[in-house]
Amino acid sequence: MQRLNGRIGHAISRLTHIHPDQSGIYPLSDGLDAFAARMKLADLAEQTLDLQYYIWNKDMSGMLMYSVVQRAADRGVRVRLLLDDNNTRGLDKILLALDQHPNIEVRLFNAFQTRAVRAFSYLTDFARLNRRMHNKSFTIDNQATIIGGRNVGDEYFSAGGEQLFSDLDVLAIGPVVEQVGRDFQRYWDCPSVSLLAQVVPPPRRKNKNTISSKMGQVSVDPHAERYVKRLEQADFFVRLQDGNLPFIWAKTRLLSDDPAKALGQVADKALLTSRLKSVINEPEQRLDIISPYFVPTRAGVEQLIMLAEKGVRVAVLTNSLKANDVAIVHAGYAKWRRTLLQHGIKLYELKRDSVTDRQPRDRGLTGKSGSSLHAKTFSVDSREVFVGSFNFDPRSAMLNTEMGFVIGSEELAETIHGLFIGTLNQNAYEVGLDEHGKMYWREHDGDRVVIHWQEPQTHILERWFIRALYHLPVDWLL
């Protein structure tokens, strides 16, 4: 491990000189740390800030991040913001205000031509609009980058109320950052990207004060004030100020879909999934999969069974029905549970707990106040880790563009495995089959072990609905 201290360029150059062929990786499993890292990096930026996101909400943390971006532009940093257009409803005025800044340019991926009634566009242009840019990256000065599972919004940064997404990003420095920079550029210039002015009508009058007025509303919010104070105490800030931000140094490679995937113009062998198979060695001992949406399909089930039959311990952590925010996706997983269990594959489902806001923050893969898993990672044996935006489902494999790092680090693999194991006991149900083949969910509730014979925290109508969805031929959409 090494430390980052001082001005970003000088400090990073000093560290990468010591590790010329490796990248420095710092995991960000805590939501506060993840926001603090982005905010601090943006404040340290001197030349460029390249941002690529699937979702950027107009909530407290989203507006705080917009203000950070504008602050960087005000001091001369060139900002490029690339957003997928699927989740920009209600953001046009804010994006226009940003785009009017001389140092900020906003572009939209796979834009809706009809801004007001987007559902109509899906009816008339479904084949195109069904393909989205799911990539997520935050890069400054081509020196440091953050990639992973988090979008920008309160639920991703421990800033929301009832729902918290448990997620994982990594901060990276070193050679892999150049790979991310080149990848951002090819997306920025690709045919699926539109200038904001091409799809959003210009305002009747300058609206440069839009962000300032929104930030004024946020600044008088007591919850926002408390959140900013928590940010100042975030572990990332404390470590950075103490000159004690440890990096794991490892061979790291970016895998990213060609943006032409959004046009259906990429051969199967060039997809991220195919390249993963060629880059990562086949597991020999252990495969830990963490994915919020786990839809293995028949082909995926057969591959996992094959590994299990070779003696590989395969374990999957995904959302329970109650924790899953997309019911039909849960159906795409649930119909394969029995088959996977019968072949020795371990299945764990994250609980949807009702925990008060006064509880201490969980620093693993789970959160407080009704958590929902959103991290996307897997580790192979104790040698390789993938962290990125990719879900284990057909949509990520075939429709959406995705990105992630393959990191050859025993230390990080053990860290991820430790987070995985630490999550299971009190925060997840273990799914199993009894001697008669009946499915159960084992829950550890303090010192007690509780066995559930139905999907926990659900009612009969929810379970009937999920079973009905088993038979719909929609796996390719999930």
Kindly label every feature range from the protein language model.
Residues 1-134, 140-478:
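Charged, low-complexity intrinsically disordered terminal segments
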